[in-house]
Protein backbone atom coordinates (compact mmCIF):
# COMPACT_ATOMS: atom_id res chain seq x y z
CA UNK A 1 0.00 0.00 0.00
CA UNK A 2 1.27 3.48 -0.86
CA UNK A 3 0.39 6.77 0.79
CA UNK A 4 1.30 10.24 -0.53
CA UNK A 5 2.16 13.04 1.92
CA UNK A 6 2.71 16.64 0.71
CA UNK A 7 5.06 19.21 2.23
CA UNK A 8 2.16 21.46 3.37
CA UNK A 9 0.78 18.58 5.40
CA UNK A 10 4.16 17.97 6.99
CA UNK A 11 4.50 21.63 8.08
CA UNK A 12 0.81 22.06 9.09
CA UNK A 13 -0.69 21.93 12.59
CA UNK A 14 -1.87 18.39 12.08
CA UNK A 15 1.21 17.06 13.81
CA UNK A 16 0.57 18.97 17.01
CA UNK A 17 -2.73 17.19 17.62
CA UNK A 18 -1.21 13.73 17.52
CA UNK A 19 -0.26 12.21 20.90
CA UNK A 20 3.16 10.63 21.27
CA UNK A 21 3.05 6.95 20.34
CA UNK A 22 3.38 4.22 22.97
CA UNK A 23 6.56 2.18 22.94
CA UNK A 24 6.26 -0.98 21.01
CA UNK A 25 8.43 -4.06 20.88
CA UNK A 26 11.06 -4.11 18.26
CA UNK A 27 10.29 -5.92 15.12
CA UNK A 28 11.65 -6.05 11.69
CA UNK A 29 10.63 -3.11 9.59
CA UNK A 30 10.45 -3.36 5.86
CA UNK A 31 12.66 -1.02 3.93
CA UNK A 32 11.04 2.34 3.36
CA UNK A 33 11.62 3.96 0.02
CA UNK A 34 10.98 7.63 -0.72
CA UNK A 35 10.34 9.00 -4.15
CA UNK A 36 10.59 12.76 -4.74
CA UNK A 37 8.49 14.18 -7.57
CA UNK A 38 8.40 18.00 -7.60
CA UNK A 39 7.31 18.89 -4.05
CA UNK A 40 5.68 15.53 -3.15
CA UNK A 41 7.22 12.76 -1.05
CA UNK A 42 6.01 9.21 -1.57
CA UNK A 43 6.53 6.71 1.25
CA UNK A 44 5.83 3.06 0.48
CA UNK A 45 5.95 0.00 2.64
CA UNK A 46 5.42 -3.57 1.56
CA UNK A 47 4.65 -6.84 3.34
CA UNK A 48 2.39 -5.58 6.23
CA UNK A 49 -1.25 -4.76 6.79
CA UNK A 50 -3.00 -1.43 7.19
CA UNK A 51 -2.72 -1.31 10.99
CA UNK A 52 1.02 -1.75 11.05
CA UNK A 53 1.41 0.88 8.35
CA UNK A 54 -0.57 3.47 10.28
CA UNK A 55 1.40 2.85 13.48
CA UNK A 56 4.67 3.08 11.63
CA UNK A 57 3.52 6.27 9.91
CA UNK A 58 2.54 7.94 13.20
CA UNK A 59 5.82 7.00 14.84
CA UNK A 60 7.83 8.23 11.90
CA UNK A 61 5.95 11.51 11.68
CA UNK A 62 6.30 12.13 15.42
CA UNK A 63 10.04 11.52 15.28
CA UNK A 64 10.39 13.84 12.29
CA UNK A 65 8.45 16.59 14.10
CA UNK A 66 10.67 16.28 17.15
CA UNK A 67 13.75 16.68 15.00
CA UNK A 68 12.29 19.78 13.42
CA UNK A 69 11.63 21.32 16.84
CA UNK A 70 15.20 20.64 17.92
CA UNK A 71 16.52 22.27 14.78
CA UNK A 72 14.28 25.30 15.30
CA UNK A 73 15.74 25.79 18.80
CA UNK A 74 19.37 25.44 17.80
CA UNK A 75 19.39 27.43 14.54
CA UNK A 76 18.36 30.95 13.63
CA UNK A 77 15.61 31.94 11.24
CA UNK A 78 16.75 31.19 7.65
CA UNK A 79 16.37 33.71 4.82
CA UNK A 80 13.34 33.34 2.54
CA UNK A 81 13.87 31.44 -0.66
CA UNK A 82 11.82 30.92 -3.78
CA UNK A 83 10.30 27.53 -4.41
CA UNK A 84 10.57 26.71 -8.13
CA UNK A 85 8.36 23.97 -9.59
CA UNK A 86 9.85 21.17 -11.57
CA UNK A 87 10.28 22.48 -15.12
CA UNK A 88 10.90 19.06 -16.59
CA UNK A 89 7.44 17.82 -15.65
CA UNK A 90 5.39 21.03 -15.85
CA UNK A 91 7.57 23.66 -17.53
CA UNK A 92 4.98 25.00 -19.92
CA UNK A 93 2.03 24.64 -17.52
CA UNK A 94 3.63 26.50 -14.56
CA UNK A 95 5.21 29.25 -16.64
CA UNK A 96 2.39 31.70 -15.92
CA UNK A 97 2.28 31.06 -12.15
CA UNK A 98 4.13 33.51 -9.88
CA UNK A 99 6.86 32.04 -7.65
CA UNK A 100 5.83 31.04 -4.08
CA UNK A 101 7.88 32.47 -1.22
CA UNK A 102 8.39 30.06 1.65
CA UNK A 103 10.73 29.79 4.55
CA UNK A 104 13.65 27.52 4.02
CA UNK A 105 13.88 24.80 6.59
CA UNK A 106 17.48 24.05 7.36
CA UNK A 107 18.52 20.95 9.11
CA UNK A 108 21.46 21.10 11.50
CA UNK A 109 23.77 18.15 11.29
CA UNK A 110 23.13 16.03 14.33
CA UNK A 111 25.36 13.41 15.66
CA UNK A 112 23.86 10.05 15.17
CA UNK A 113 24.63 7.87 18.08
CA UNK A 114 24.81 4.20 17.96
CA UNK A 115 21.69 4.02 20.07
CA UNK A 116 19.70 6.15 17.65
CA UNK A 117 20.91 4.14 14.73
CA UNK A 118 19.81 1.05 16.48
CA UNK A 119 16.35 2.50 16.99
CA UNK A 120 14.21 2.00 13.87
CA UNK A 121 12.32 5.24 14.52
CA UNK A 122 15.49 7.24 14.56
CA UNK A 123 16.67 5.38 11.50
CA UNK A 124 13.53 6.36 9.65
CA UNK A 125 14.00 9.98 10.71
CA UNK A 126 17.55 9.94 9.40
CA UNK A 127 16.37 8.53 6.10
CA UNK A 128 13.64 11.17 5.85
CA UNK A 129 16.15 13.92 6.57
CA UNK A 130 18.42 12.59 3.87
CA UNK A 131 15.54 12.63 1.45
CA UNK A 132 14.83 16.25 2.32
CA UNK A 133 18.46 17.16 1.78
CA UNK A 134 18.43 15.36 -1.54
CA UNK A 135 15.34 17.36 -2.46
CA UNK A 136 17.07 20.66 -1.69
CA UNK A 137 20.17 19.55 -3.56
CA UNK A 138 17.98 18.65 -6.52
CA UNK A 139 16.42 22.12 -6.45
CA UNK A 140 19.88 23.69 -6.38
CA UNK A 141 20.91 21.59 -9.34
CA UNK A 142 17.81 22.67 -11.24
CA UNK A 143 18.60 26.31 -10.48
CA UNK A 144 22.15 25.86 -11.72
CA UNK A 145 20.98 24.17 -14.91
CA UNK A 146 18.54 27.03 -15.68
CA UNK A 147 21.27 29.69 -15.95
CA UNK A 148 23.33 27.98 -18.63
CA UNK A 149 23.57 29.55 -22.09
CA UNK A 150 21.22 28.74 -24.93
CA UNK A 151 23.92 26.89 -26.83
CA UNK A 152 24.64 24.61 -23.93
CA UNK A 153 20.95 23.96 -23.43
CA UNK A 154 20.47 23.13 -27.11
CA UNK A 155 23.42 20.77 -27.01
CA UNK A 156 22.40 19.17 -23.74
CA UNK A 157 18.65 18.99 -24.37
CA UNK A 158 18.85 15.26 -24.81
CA UNK A 159 20.84 14.81 -21.58
CA UNK A 160 17.93 15.92 -19.36
CA UNK A 161 15.46 13.27 -20.56
CA UNK A 162 15.28 9.60 -19.74
CA UNK A 163 18.10 8.27 -17.56
CA UNK A 164 20.47 11.22 -18.07
CA UNK A 165 19.13 12.95 -14.92
CA UNK A 166 20.66 10.19 -12.82
CA UNK A 167 24.12 10.74 -14.33
CA UNK A 168 23.98 14.50 -13.75
CA UNK A 169 22.52 14.30 -10.23
CA UNK A 170 24.96 16.07 -7.88
CA UNK A 171 23.64 14.15 -4.86
CA UNK A 172 24.64 10.84 -6.36
CA UNK A 173 27.96 12.31 -7.47
CA UNK A 174 28.66 13.45 -3.91
CA UNK A 175 27.73 10.08 -2.49
CA UNK A 176 29.97 8.36 -5.02
CA UNK A 177 32.87 10.72 -4.19
CA UNK A 178 32.47 10.15 -0.45
CA UNK A 179 31.16 13.61 0.43
CA UNK A 180 28.46 14.16 3.00
CA UNK A 181 25.54 16.13 1.56
CA UNK A 182 24.24 16.83 5.11
CA UNK A 183 27.34 18.81 6.15
CA UNK A 184 27.30 20.89 2.96
CA UNK A 185 23.61 21.74 3.23
CA UNK A 186 23.98 25.09 5.07
CA UNK A 187 26.76 26.32 2.80
CA UNK A 188 24.71 25.67 -0.32
CA UNK A 189 21.45 27.05 1.11
CA UNK A 190 22.95 30.56 1.43
CA UNK A 191 23.22 31.13 -2.35
CA UNK A 192 20.11 29.19 -3.18
CA UNK A 193 17.73 32.14 -2.78
CA UNK A 194 19.68 34.41 -5.12
CA UNK A 195 20.04 31.77 -7.81
CA UNK A 196 16.41 30.76 -7.59
CA UNK A 197 15.30 34.40 -7.71
CA UNK A 198 17.45 35.00 -10.79
CA UNK A 199 16.20 31.91 -12.55
CA UNK A 200 12.59 32.61 -11.62
CA UNK A 201 12.82 36.20 -12.80
CA UNK A 202 14.13 34.99 -16.13
CA UNK A 203 11.15 32.66 -16.41
CA UNK A 204 8.47 35.29 -15.78
CA UNK A 205 5.98 35.46 -18.66
CA UNK A 206 6.32 38.45 -20.95
CA UNK A 207 3.67 40.08 -23.15
CA UNK A 208 5.91 39.58 -26.15
CA UNK A 209 5.75 35.80 -25.80
CA UNK A 210 2.71 35.73 -28.07
CA UNK A 211 4.66 37.36 -30.89
CA UNK A 212 7.50 34.86 -30.73
CA UNK A 213 6.55 31.75 -32.66
CA UNK A 214 8.54 28.64 -32.01
CA UNK A 215 10.79 30.18 -29.33
CA UNK A 216 9.90 27.67 -26.61
CA UNK A 217 12.64 25.16 -26.06
CA UNK A 218 12.68 21.89 -24.16
CA UNK A 219 14.36 23.17 -20.98
CA UNK A 220 12.50 26.49 -20.71
CA UNK A 221 11.66 29.75 -22.44
CA UNK A 222 14.21 31.59 -24.55
CA UNK A 223 13.21 35.20 -24.04
CA UNK A 224 13.88 37.54 -27.02
CA UNK A 225 16.25 40.39 -26.44
CA UNK A 226 15.51 44.01 -27.26
CA UNK A 227 17.55 43.82 -30.44
CA UNK A 228 15.62 40.83 -31.71
CA UNK A 229 12.30 42.50 -30.92
CA UNK A 230 13.43 45.65 -32.71
CA UNK A 231 14.60 43.64 -35.69
CA UNK A 232 11.30 41.78 -35.84
CA UNK A 233 9.32 45.03 -35.75
CA UNK A 234 11.56 46.45 -38.49
CA UNK A 235 10.95 43.39 -40.63
CA UNK A 236 7.20 43.69 -40.15
CA UNK A 237 7.27 47.38 -41.05
CA UNK A 238 9.37 46.74 -44.15
CA UNK A 239 7.01 43.95 -45.22
CA UNK A 240 4.03 46.28 -44.71
CA UNK A 241 5.68 49.01 -46.81
CA UNK A 242 6.52 46.47 -49.48
CA UNK A 243 2.88 45.37 -49.63
CA UNK A 244 1.75 49.00 -49.92
CA UNK A 245 4.22 49.62 -52.76
CA UNK A 246 3.10 46.51 -54.56
CA UNK A 247 -0.56 47.50 -54.20
CA UNK A 248 0.15 51.02 -55.52
CA UNK A 249 2.16 49.63 -58.44
CA UNK A 250 -0.62 47.18 -59.24
CA UNK A 251 -3.16 50.03 -59.17
CA UNK A 252 -1.03 52.06 -61.60
CA UNK A 253 -0.73 49.09 -63.93
CA UNK A 254 -4.49 48.56 -63.87
CA UNK A 255 -5.06 52.24 -64.73
CA UNK A 256 -2.59 52.02 -67.60
CA UNK A 257 -4.29 48.88 -68.90
CA UNK A 258 -7.70 50.59 -68.81
CA UNK A 259 -6.31 53.65 -70.64
CA UNK A 260 -4.62 51.49 -73.28
CA UNK A 261 -7.84 49.54 -73.79
CA UNK A 262 -9.75 52.80 -74.40
CA UNK A 263 -7.10 54.00 -76.87
CA UNK A 264 -7.14 50.62 -78.59
CA UNK A 265 -10.91 50.74 -79.07
CA UNK A 266 -10.68 54.29 -80.47
CA UNK A 267 -7.92 53.27 -82.87
CA UNK A 268 -9.94 50.26 -83.98
CA UNK A 269 -12.90 52.49 -84.81
CA UNK A 270 -10.66 54.85 -86.78
CA UNK A 271 -9.08 51.94 -88.64
CA UNK A 272 -12.54 50.61 -89.55
CA UNK A 273 -13.57 54.06 -90.87
CA UNK A 274 -10.34 54.38 -92.88
CA UNK A 275 -10.81 50.90 -94.33
CA UNK A 276 -14.33 51.84 -95.42
CA UNK A 277 -13.07 55.03 -97.05
CA UNK A 278 -10.29 53.10 -98.78
CA UNK A 279 -12.76 50.58 -100.17
CA UNK A 280 -15.03 53.37 -101.45
CA UNK A 281 -12.10 55.20 -103.03
CA UNK A 282 -10.90 51.97 -104.63
CA UNK A 283 -14.34 51.39 -106.17
CA UNK A 284 -14.49 54.99 -107.43
CA UNK A 285 -11.00 54.63 -108.85
CA UNK A 286 -11.99 51.54 -110.80
CA UNK A 287 -15.09 53.32 -112.13
CA UNK A 288 -13.04 56.35 -113.17
CA UNK A 289 -10.49 54.15 -114.87
CA UNK A 290 -13.23 52.42 -116.83
CA UNK A 291 -14.69 55.79 -117.84
CA UNK A 292 -11.25 57.02 -118.83
CA UNK A 293 -10.69 53.97 -121.02
CA UNK A 294 -14.08 54.51 -122.63
CA UNK A 295 -13.31 58.15 -123.34
CA UNK A 296 -9.94 57.23 -124.74
CA UNK A 297 -11.57 54.72 -127.07
CA UNK A 298 -14.13 57.31 -128.17
CA UNK A 299 -11.43 59.91 -128.78
CA UNK A 300 -9.43 57.44 -130.78
CA UNK A 301 -12.48 56.52 -132.84
CA UNK A 302 -13.24 60.20 -133.47
CA UNK A 303 -9.67 60.88 -134.51
CA UNK A 304 -9.73 57.93 -136.87
CA UNK A 305 -13.03 59.09 -138.40
CA UNK A 306 -11.77 62.65 -138.81
CA UNK A 307 -8.57 61.44 -140.39
CA UNK A 308 -10.47 59.26 -142.82
CA UNK A 309 -12.77 62.17 -143.78
CA UNK A 310 -9.79 64.42 -144.32
CA UNK A 311 -8.11 61.84 -146.50
CA UNK A 312 -11.27 61.38 -148.56
CA UNK A 313 -11.78 65.13 -148.97
CA UNK A 314 -8.22 65.67 -150.08
CA UNK A 315 -8.58 63.09 -152.86
CA UNK A 316 -11.74 64.60 -154.50
CA UNK A 317 -11.10 65.46 -158.28
CA UNK A 318 -12.28 68.65 -159.92
CA UNK A 319 -14.63 66.84 -162.23
CA UNK A 320 -16.06 63.34 -162.03
CA UNK A 321 -15.55 61.37 -165.24
CA UNK A 322 -18.59 59.51 -166.42
CA UNK A 323 -18.13 56.68 -168.84
CA UNK A 324 -20.53 56.46 -171.76
CA UNK A 325 -22.71 53.39 -172.17
CA UNK A 326 -22.21 50.91 -174.98
CA UNK A 327 -24.13 51.52 -178.25
CA UNK A 328 -26.22 48.43 -177.73
CA UNK A 329 -29.93 49.24 -177.66
CA UNK A 330 -31.04 46.16 -175.79
CA UNK A 331 -28.51 46.16 -172.93
CA UNK A 332 -29.23 48.47 -169.95
CA UNK A 333 -26.98 51.40 -169.31
CA UNK A 334 -24.61 50.57 -166.44
CA UNK A 335 -24.17 53.23 -163.75
CA UNK A 336 -20.97 55.21 -163.84
CA UNK A 337 -18.24 54.06 -161.43
CA UNK A 338 -18.19 55.90 -158.09
CA UNK A 339 -14.80 56.51 -156.53
CA UNK A 340 -14.18 55.97 -152.84
CA UNK A 341 -14.17 59.66 -152.00
CA UNK A 342 -16.32 62.22 -150.28
CA UNK A 343 -18.03 62.94 -153.64
CA UNK A 344 -18.94 59.29 -154.04
CA UNK A 345 -20.26 59.25 -150.43
CA UNK A 346 -22.41 62.28 -151.13
CA UNK A 347 -23.68 60.88 -154.45
CA UNK A 348 -24.47 57.49 -152.84
CA UNK A 349 -26.38 59.20 -150.05
CA UNK A 350 -28.47 61.34 -152.42
CA UNK A 351 -29.02 58.66 -155.09
CA UNK A 352 -32.73 58.21 -154.30
CA UNK A 353 -33.49 61.85 -153.48
CA UNK A 354 -35.39 64.18 -155.71
CA UNK A 355 -33.09 66.14 -158.02
CA UNK A 356 -35.54 69.00 -158.28
CA UNK A 357 -34.82 70.16 -154.66
CA UNK A 358 -32.40 73.06 -154.79
CA UNK A 359 -29.70 74.25 -152.36
CA UNK A 360 -30.80 77.28 -150.44
CA UNK A 361 -27.58 77.70 -148.44
CA UNK A 362 -25.03 78.15 -151.15
CA UNK A 363 -25.37 79.07 -154.80
CA UNK A 364 -23.49 76.73 -157.02
CA UNK A 365 -22.51 77.41 -160.57
CA UNK A 366 -24.63 75.41 -162.91
CA UNK A 367 -22.75 72.94 -165.03
CA UNK A 368 -24.02 71.56 -168.22
CA UNK A 369 -24.03 67.87 -168.66
CA UNK A 370 -21.15 66.74 -170.75
CA UNK A 371 -22.03 65.50 -174.19
CA UNK A 372 -20.26 62.25 -173.56
CA UNK A 373 -22.92 61.25 -170.99
CA UNK A 374 -25.72 61.43 -173.58
CA UNK A 375 -24.80 59.01 -176.25
CA UNK A 376 -27.57 57.42 -178.29
CA UNK A 377 -30.39 58.45 -175.94
CA UNK A 378 -31.36 60.13 -172.64
CA UNK A 379 -30.13 59.25 -169.10
CA UNK A 380 -32.43 57.86 -166.47
CA UNK A 381 -33.64 59.90 -163.50
CA UNK A 382 -31.37 58.06 -161.08
CA UNK A 383 -28.32 58.75 -163.11
CA UNK A 384 -29.27 62.39 -163.43
CA UNK A 385 -29.70 62.79 -159.67
CA UNK A 386 -26.38 61.15 -158.97
CA UNK A 387 -24.60 63.35 -161.48
CA UNK A 388 -26.25 66.48 -160.05
CA UNK A 389 -25.23 65.62 -156.48
CA UNK A 390 -21.68 64.93 -157.49
CA UNK A 391 -21.55 68.18 -159.43
CA UNK A 392 -22.83 70.17 -156.43
CA UNK A 393 -20.30 68.62 -154.05
CA UNK A 394 -17.44 69.11 -156.44
CA UNK A 395 -18.35 72.74 -156.92
CA UNK A 396 -18.55 73.35 -153.17
CA UNK A 397 -15.14 71.80 -152.60
CA UNK A 398 -13.61 73.88 -155.39
CA UNK A 399 -15.03 77.10 -153.92
CA UNK A 400 -13.66 76.32 -150.44
CA UNK A 401 -10.23 75.43 -151.81
CA UNK A 402 -10.14 78.57 -153.93
CA UNK A 403 -11.07 80.72 -150.95
CA UNK A 404 -8.48 79.10 -148.73
CA UNK A 405 -5.78 79.40 -151.33
CA UNK A 406 -6.38 83.14 -151.77
CA UNK A 407 -5.94 83.89 -148.02
CA UNK A 408 -2.74 85.71 -147.11
CA UNK A 409 -0.32 83.54 -145.14
CA UNK A 410 0.72 86.21 -142.66
CA UNK A 411 -0.25 89.73 -141.64
CA UNK A 412 1.81 92.94 -141.94
CA UNK A 413 3.11 92.61 -138.39
CA UNK A 414 4.46 89.15 -139.17
CA UNK A 415 1.98 87.28 -136.97
CA UNK A 416 -0.39 84.63 -138.20
CA UNK A 417 -3.93 86.03 -138.70
CA UNK A 418 -6.75 84.42 -136.80
CA UNK A 419 -8.29 81.45 -138.54
CA UNK A 420 -11.36 82.04 -140.66
CA UNK A 421 -14.05 79.45 -140.64
CA UNK A 422 -15.53 78.71 -144.01
CA UNK A 423 -18.33 76.24 -144.44
CA UNK A 424 -20.58 74.96 -147.19
CA UNK A 425 -23.95 73.33 -146.70
CA UNK A 426 -25.18 71.02 -149.41
CA UNK A 427 -28.68 69.52 -149.37
CA UNK A 428 -28.40 65.90 -150.32
CA UNK A 429 -32.12 65.17 -150.13
CA UNK A 430 -35.39 66.40 -148.71
CA UNK A 431 -34.32 65.53 -145.19
CA UNK A 432 -30.49 65.44 -145.36
CA UNK A 433 -27.88 68.17 -145.42
CA UNK A 434 -24.13 67.92 -145.38
CA UNK A 435 -21.64 70.56 -144.29
CA UNK A 436 -18.02 70.83 -145.27
CA UNK A 437 -16.17 73.33 -143.10
CA UNK A 438 -12.57 74.44 -143.07
CA UNK A 439 -11.16 76.11 -139.98
CA UNK A 440 -8.30 77.97 -141.66
CA UNK A 441 -5.58 75.52 -140.80
CA UNK A 442 -3.86 73.13 -143.13
CA UNK A 443 -5.49 69.73 -143.34
CA UNK A 444 -8.15 70.71 -140.85
CA UNK A 445 -11.42 69.72 -142.40
CA UNK A 446 -14.65 68.99 -140.60
CA UNK A 447 -17.58 67.12 -142.02
CA UNK A 448 -21.07 67.18 -140.53
CA UNK A 449 -24.19 65.41 -141.61
CA UNK A 450 -27.49 66.69 -140.35
CA UNK A 451 -30.83 64.98 -140.77
CA UNK A 452 -34.18 66.60 -140.23
CA UNK A 453 -36.93 64.54 -138.73
From Swiss-Prot:
Q: In which tissues is it expressed?
A: Seed endosperm.
The bZIP domain sits at 225-288
Q: Where is the composition biased (Acidic residues)?
A: 207-216
Question: Looking at the record, which segments are called Basic motif?
Answer: 228-251
Q: Where is this region: Disordered?
A: 145-243
Keyword list (alphabetical) reads:
Activator, DNA-binding, Nucleus, Transcription, Transcription regulation
CDD domains per the record?
Answer: bZIP_plant_GBF1
Spell out the Polar residues composition-biased ranges: 146-175
Question: Transcription regulation among the record's keywords?
Answer: yes
One GO MF term attached to the UniProt entry:
DNA binding
Q: Please describe the quaternary structure of this protein.
A: Interacts with the Dof zinc finger protein PBF.
Provide the function of this protein.
Involved in the regulation of the endosperm-specific production of albumin b-32 and other zein proteins. It is a trans-acting transcriptional activator that binds to the consensus sequence 5'-GATGAYRTGR-3'.
**The protein's name in its UniProt record:** Regulatory protein opaque-2
Species whose genome carries this gene: Zea mays (Maize)
- Recall the taxonomic lineage recorded for the source organism: Eukaryota, Viridiplantae, Streptophyta, Embryophyta, Tracheophyta
Gene designation: O2
Amino acid sequence: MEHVISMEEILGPFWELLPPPAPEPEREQPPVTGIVVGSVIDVAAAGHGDGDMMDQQHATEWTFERLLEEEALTTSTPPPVVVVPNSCCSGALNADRPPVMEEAVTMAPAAVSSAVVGDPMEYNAILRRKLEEDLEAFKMWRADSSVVTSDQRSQGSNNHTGGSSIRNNPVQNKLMNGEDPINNNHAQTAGLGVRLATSSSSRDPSPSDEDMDGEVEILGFKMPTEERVRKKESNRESARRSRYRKAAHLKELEDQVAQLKAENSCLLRRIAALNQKYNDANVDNRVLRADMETLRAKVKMGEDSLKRVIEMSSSVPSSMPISAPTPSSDAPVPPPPIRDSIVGYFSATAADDDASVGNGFLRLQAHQEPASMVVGGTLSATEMNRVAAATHCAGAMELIQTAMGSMPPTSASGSTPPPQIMSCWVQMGPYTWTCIRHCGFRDRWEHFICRRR
